[in-house]
């Protein structure tokens, strides 16, 4: 358990812009002291839940614009409880929110379960992890260097 003396410090610098349909929703938040991702909530009308049928996907608004600091990205990831209990997960995972993107963050959900799933206003639907970005100089070569592994992939190292 984290006490105020040993709780990890939050790094300042994430600015959010609340959109009109995000009014009244809690800010994205880290639900525990050790959480890596902040939970994102559905910014749907209270009287219009969204039903995602098995095999269907839906784009769910969060009601916020995130001003991700330069040199970082926001990674949209599924919530494990929704995936395990209902088969609800995020497509394009992790989805990347670039630091220069200034539109509303939306979450692309898919229902891999057997039952319809209702997304309601304020429901925690995904999480966002803020991570540093490394950009490399890109150059073309005439051939690849040799390694012990070579071009082996897709199970080439075995399972045991």
Swiss-Prot record:
SUPFAM superfamilies found in the cross-reference section: dUTPase-like
Highest taxon, organism lineage: Bacteria
Statement: the UniProt record of this protein carries the keyword Magnesium: yes
The entry's keywords: Hydrolase, Magnesium, Metal-binding, Nucleotide metabolism
Catalytic activities: dUTP + H2O = dUMP + diphosphate + H(+)
Enzyme class of the recorded protein, top EC level: hydrolase
Disulphide bonds in the chain: none
Pathway: Pyrimidine metabolism; dUMP biosynthesis; dUMP from dCTP (dUTP route): step 2/2
Binding positions for substrate per the UniProt entry: 79-81, 92, 96-98, 106
EC numbers, comma separated: 3.6.1.23
GO biological process: dUMP biosynthetic process; dUTP catabolic process
GO molecular function: dUTP diphosphatase activity; magnesium ion binding
Function: This enzyme is involved in nucleotide metabolism: it produces dUMP, the immediate precursor of thymidine nucleotides and it decreases the intracellular concentration of dUTP so that uracil cannot be incorporated into DNA.
Similarity remark: Belongs to the dUTPase family.
PANTHER family xrefs: DEOXYURIDINE 5'-TRIPHOSPHATE NUCLEOTIDOHYDROLASE
UniProt protein name: Deoxyuridine 5'-triphosphate nucleotidohydrolase
Organism: Rhizobium meliloti (strain 1021)
Upper lineage: Bacteria, Pseudomonadati, Pseudomonadota, Alphaproteobacteria, Hyphomicrobiales
């Amino acid at each position: 358990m984290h006490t105020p003396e040993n709780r990890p410090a939050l790094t300042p610098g994430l600015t959010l812009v609340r959109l009109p349909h995000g009014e009244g929703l809690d800010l994205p938040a880290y639900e525990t002291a050790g959480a890596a991702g902040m939970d994102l909530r559905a910014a749907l009308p209270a009287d219009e839940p969204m039903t995602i049928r098995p095999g269907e996907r839906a784009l769910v608004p969060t009601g916020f614009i995130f001003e991700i600091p330069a040199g970082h990205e926001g990674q949209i990831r599924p919530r494990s409880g929704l995936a395990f209990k209902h088969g609800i997960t995020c497509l394009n995972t992790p989805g990347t929110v670039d630091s220069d993107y200034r539109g509303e963050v939306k979450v692309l959900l898919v229902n891999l379960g057997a039952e319809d799933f209702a997304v309601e206003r304020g429901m925690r639907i995904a999480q966002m992890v803020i991570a540093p970005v490394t950009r490399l100089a890109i150059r073309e070569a005439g051939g690849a260097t040799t390694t012990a592994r070579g071009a082996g992939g897709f199970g080439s190292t075995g399972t045991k």
